[in-house]
Amino acid sequence: MANKKILVVGSANMDLSMNMYKVPDVGETLIDDGGVAYVPGGKGANAAVALTKLGADCHFCAKVGADLHGQKLYQYYKEFGINTSYLKVDREHPTGLAVVMKESDGNNRIIVYPGANGNLTVENINEAFECEPDALYLGFEIPFAIALSAAKIAASRGIPIFVDAAPAGKDYPLESLPMVEIFSPNEKETETFTGILPQGTDSALRAALALYKRVKAKYIVIKQGERGAFVYDGKHFFVIPSIRIGKAIDTTAAGDAFTAALTVEYLRSNNIRNAVKFGVAAGAITVTRKGASASIPTDDEVRALILKEDLI
């Protein structure tokens, strides 16, 4: 089967990644030599890298600044084989920057400065659809109005839509989104959208029901980290448990890898259970490696883990 062409409309950031024993408390100054580095990131870009590594023909629509970070990101995407025909340059705003603070237990806190990401336009989106994609992959690190425009264009053309619902905003009019194939937030994003933190099966079901009332989706897939993933289709639910293959080093791109892998496998198999297992396996590998997009596994690596764990 030919590789599916997936259009990613999302963010492109340079990440300032800082490793530390713990983040400082209010009023506290810490000295920590855990290491600091600039690495490619952004949820849209991470997804584009993941989709490409997992076998998709990925076209990336995003905006970077006319600066050194933008130049480095462009070259990085080209080297990965991502189609950058719709990667635009903003000459008035810098490339987006994310400050990623990673604690020794693998957990992280992220602050994003949108920069050029906030200036992606409807015209940019319309041009990107000239690639005639098989699917649209959306994230919310760009203005919600632009994400909504992309979704409406896709819906008008009968193109399936996959939403990695991050980051979340309480005021996002989710009801205005057209029908999407999969809507996938993590636990904290689900809490922001619904007021319910899905930490167990009962609370996850209540949260999924609340989301289902707001979002027109074939499937709600809640990423639950160490608990795996919770899936609801409006009538039934199931849980795919997580896989632990080693110490969690960096969770930065785990959600991006999960949703990208879920999307690729769903488009290949049209089987939601197998697709979620594929996503869980991709996320399990990702957290054992440092970095954002650099930590994302290949299709072969994910399939090898699935065979080893007898998941499918």
Residue ranges and their predicted role:
Residues L7, H59, Y137, F162-D164, ...:
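Structural detector of well-ordered beta-strand residues that form the stable sheet scaffold
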Residues A135-R206, R227-G228:
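Conserved beta-alpha-beta core of the PfkB/ribokinase-like small-molecule kinase fold
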Residues E28-I31, Y38, K53-D134, R303-I312:
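Conserved N-terminal subdomain of the carbohydrate kinase-like
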Residues I6, K170, T201-I312:
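Conserved phosphate-binding/catalytic region of the ribokinase-like
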Residues A128-E130, P173-S176, K213:
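Structural alpha-helical scaffold elements that stabilize or flank donor/cofactor-binding regions
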Residues I125, T190-E191, A229, V302:
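A generic structural signal for short hydrophobic patches within well-formed alpha-helices
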